[in-house]
């Protein structure tokens, strides 16, 4: 049994989402180990929980191949610092949160030196670059997965993995309060809304805004009382969206929101969105959705050959069924998107029944992944510390 008084935990988060996860994990661990010392790379949330950071987390929060190449010397220097510090400190366990390209090499070197390692948030090995699982097996004593199908994939390769549930499923109510979301957005609850979420990346906004706006125009013709909510992550993406809108749909009225995507999903009768984590959030908000995705033809050509899954959206992957329409590349047209979206907006008896049935399925999936992830993750760390994995 580990001495609770002298425990040291190495922990590295590489971006904001990881910092939030890390803070929740530290909080849960301190219930069992109030004297524990945490050291690694932390953002403001983990720092607030008492974690000591070796460098500013922003120094490793780099996205995109070009940016990674540009900052590679700095990233390698920081990784060396983390490894040297951990070998000197000899923590009882090292936890890498997400950021697999940064963390797995650290975990590999530390594990070889006899330090227990845990990787929190499975890389998408089940979807593409599946051979990475062999490196993960070498680098970690245990992987913590958000979703049950991820654990099933690790089980196939006999790699120790524990399903802990998804923190987002813990935060969002099983029955979200639409009235409250309307109040937060200063919207009239009796009106009908459709949320349009074009993604947070420049390329997503570039490729998805035209068909999504054209879809909105078709929906407006068919359902004149519908209003459109457009949450955008920052001013840069809003300007990009507005420039495209001025060319594609200058007269279409939309309600711009400063972020607030979650509230928009809760308010919306239906949502049109890019694939990714947004589709999971939309499911948890109980908003019927159509998923659309477009990219450069060559990128799509490569992706089609690399991606090994039947579906691209998380609700469909979770259900292992086509719960929500996925309109990809050539199918991501205004006519096809509007046709699928209209099904959710019909006020007929069958339309209302379809919506209710879909929301019921969303609720069942929500319950499946609502497991108090912080507590489950902390228990997994404790079990590994005590050789009970």
From Swiss-Prot:
GO annotation, biological process: lipid A biosynthetic process
Query: Would the keyword Glycosyltransferase be found if you checked this record's keyword annotation?
Result: yes
Q: CDD domains, from UniProt?
A: Glycosyltransferase_GTB-type
Q: Which GO terms describe its cellular component?
A: membrane
Pfam families listed in its UniProt record: LpxB
GO MF terms here are:
lipid-A-disaccharide synthase activity; phospholipid binding
Give the family per the record. Belongs to the LpxB family.
Q: Which UniProt keywords apply?
A: Glycosyltransferase, Lipid A biosynthesis, Lipid biosynthesis, Lipid metabolism, Transferase
Cite the EC number: 2.4.1.182
Q: Which InterPro entries match?
A: Glyco_trans_19
| Biological role | Condensation of UDP-2,3-diacylglucosamine and 2,3-diacylglucosamine-1-phosphate to form lipid A disaccharide, a precursor of lipid A, a phosphorylated glycolipid that anchors the lipopolysaccharide to the outer membrane of the cell.
Spell out the protein name for this chain.
Lipid-A-disaccharide synthase
Organism superkingdom: Bacteria
* Reactions mediated catalytically: a lipid X + a UDP-2-N,3-O-bis[(3R)-3-hydroxyacyl]-alpha-D-glucosamine = a lipid A disaccharide + UDP + H(+)
- Tell me if Ribosomal protein is a UniProt keyword of this record: no
Q: In which pathway does it act?
A: Bacterial outer membrane biogenesis; LPS lipid A biosynthesis
């Amino acid at each position: 049994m580990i001495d609770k008084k002298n425990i040291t935990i190495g922990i590295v988060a590489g971006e904001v989402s990881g910092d939030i996860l890390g803070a929740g994990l530290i909080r849960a661990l301190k219930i069992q180990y109030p004297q524990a010392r945490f050291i690694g790379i932390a953002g403001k949330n983990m720092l607030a929980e008492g974690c000591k950071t070796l460098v500013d987390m922003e120094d490793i929060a780099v996205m995109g191949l070009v940016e990674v190449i540009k900052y590679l010397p700095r990233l390698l220097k920081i990784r060396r610092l983390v490894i040297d510090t951990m070998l000197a400190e000899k923590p009882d366990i090292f936890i890498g949160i997400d950021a697999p390209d940064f963390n797995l090499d650290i975990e590999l070197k530390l594990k070889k030196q006899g330090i227990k390692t845990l990787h929190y948030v499975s890389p998408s090995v089940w979807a593409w670059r599946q051979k990475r699982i062999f490196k993960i097996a070498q680098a970690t004593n245990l992987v913590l997965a958000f979703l049950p199908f991820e654990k099933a994939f690790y089980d196939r390769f006999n790699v120790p993995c524990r399903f802990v549930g998804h923190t987002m499923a813990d935060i969002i109510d099983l029955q979200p309060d639409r009235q409250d979301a309307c109040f937060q957005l200063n919207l009239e609850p009796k009106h009908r809304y459709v949320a349009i979420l074009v993604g947070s990346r420049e390329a997503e906004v570039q490729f998805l805004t035209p068909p999504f706006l054209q879809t909105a125009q078709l929906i407006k013709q068919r359902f004149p009382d519908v209003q459109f909510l457009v949450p955008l992550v920052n001013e840069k993406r809003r300007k990009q969206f507005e420039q495209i809108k001025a060319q594609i749909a200058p007269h279409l009225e939309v309600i711009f929101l400063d972020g607030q995507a979650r509230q928009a999903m809760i308010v919306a009768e239906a949502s049109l969105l890019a694939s990714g984590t947004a589709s999971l959030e939309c499911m948890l908000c109980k908003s019927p959705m159509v998923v659309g995705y477009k990219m450069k033809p060559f990128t799509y050509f490569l992706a089609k050959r690399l991606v090994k899954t039947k579906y691209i959206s998380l609700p469909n992957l979770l259900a292992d069924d086509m719960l929500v329409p996925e309109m990809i590349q050539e199918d991501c047209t205004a006519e096809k998107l509007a046709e699928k979206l209209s099904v959710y907006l019909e006020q007929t008896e069958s339309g209302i029944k379809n919506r209710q049935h879909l929301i019921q399925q969303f609720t069942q999936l929500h319950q499946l992944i609502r497991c108090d992830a912080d507590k489950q993750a902390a228990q997994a760390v404790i079990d590994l510390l005590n050789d009970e994995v």
